[in-house]
Design a protein with these regions (language model features):
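Residue-level recognition of tetratricopeptide repeat
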Residues: 71, 105, 160, 197-200, ...
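Short coil turns that delineate tetratricopeptide repeat
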Residues: 60, 94, 128, 149, ...
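N-terminal leader/linker segments that initiate helical-solenoid repeat arrays
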Residues: 18-64, 68, 305
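Canonical positions in the second alpha-helix
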Residues: 54-55, 88-89, 122-123, 144, ...
């Protein structure tokens, strides 16, 4: 019996349990279900998904329709269904890098890192020598201004999949490539953050610190403020306590910040403090399980067992 089958069987025995299977099993062996969504946000997600379903129903062979229904299905937490849509896209459009890019992302979400690496590596091979393109946002930021591109997202997620697998050297290589396509402050901050951590985990502190030269307080950050603040902390411009106090809620920023501080402790010889924060993330923020910082904390805890 697999871990997933075991947990489904156990949950079905509980009074009032829902029959739905978990979307994934954590690296620590726990079933992972979609987090509750506020009513207003859910209505918006459902309306957007309904529109995507209509477009897809009319154009099932259109690659854009396939991508959007896969993305819209994933936003409420239906990651397995999203993977099925992207797999259909891979079958119909095997030379479209976008299908592998999006499926690879969702393989990361469900903790299948080998498949994520396979898809994202394939995507990287398909974009070789081709011009980059802006990737439209499914959940636009405050300025309705996309901050990433197809190429940057492919290498960003490939680096992350390697990082989560504990292969920090390959993660660093991917993020070095990602920097070539990180053309705005938000993407520069996000890429530099994970690249810095990968180098730090390799003991390459001089190389890691050299990356921070491009990070300044004046950067016009739209959506990656947590990464930007963490990089400034690594530079010595901000304190860990001030960042943790600022991210004291229960949302994504809290997990992102705590992981960034935990990794900083771990790579600077403060293992006990780092591990304590990792446990705080895993035990205290279960509804944030799809967040990259949460997955990274889970991976670090799992490797240490």
């Amino acid at each position: 019996m697999t871990r997933l089958t075991f947990w489904v069987a156990l949950l079905l025995l509980l009074p009032g349990a829902q029959p739905a299977a978990p979307e994934a099993v954590s690296l620590l062996g726990k079933p992972l279900f979609p987090a509750p969504i506020a009513a207003e946000a859910r209505r918006t997600l459902e309306e957007n998904l309904k529109n995507a379903e209509i477009v897809y129903g009319r154009n099932p062979d259109d690659p854009d329709a396939t991508i959007w229904i896969g993305r819209r299905v994933a936003y409420p937490g239906r990651y397995r269904e999203a993977i099925e849509h992207f797999s259909d896209g891979v079958e119909k459009h095997p030379d479209d890098a976008r299908m592998y890019r999006h499926r690879g992302h969702r393989y990361i979400t469900v903790r299948d890192f080998p498949k994520a690496i396979g898809d994202l590596s394939k995507a990287a091979s398909l974009i070789a020598g081709k011009p980059d393109q802006i990737e439209p946002d499914g959940q636009p930021n405050a300025r309705n201004m996309p901050t990433s591109t197809l190429n940057s997202n492919i290498y960003y997620h490939l680096g992350l999949a390697h990082y989560l697998s504990g292969d920090f050297a390959k993660a660093a290589d991917a993020y070095q490539r990602c920097l070539e396509f990180s053309k705005n402050p938000d993407m520069l901050a996000a890429t530099t953050y994970w690249y810095y951590l990968a180098l730090a985990r390799l003991g390459r502190s001089t190389d890691a610190n050299a990356l921070l030269a491009r990070i300044t307080p004046e950067m016009d950050i739209i959506e990656n403020a947590s990464y930007h603040r963490l990089l400034r902390m690594y530079k010595g411009e901000l304190t860990a306590d001030s960042l943790l106090a600022l991210a004291s809620g229960a949302g994504l920023d809290a997990v992102t910040t705590r992981y960034g501080v935990a990794a900083w402790h771990l790579t600077n010889g403060r293992k006990d403090q780092g591990v304590a924060l990792l446990r705080e993330i895993v035990d205290g923020y279960p509804q944030q399980w799809p967040a990259f910082g949460y997955v990274a904390a889970e991976a670090d805890v799992a490797r240490a067992r």
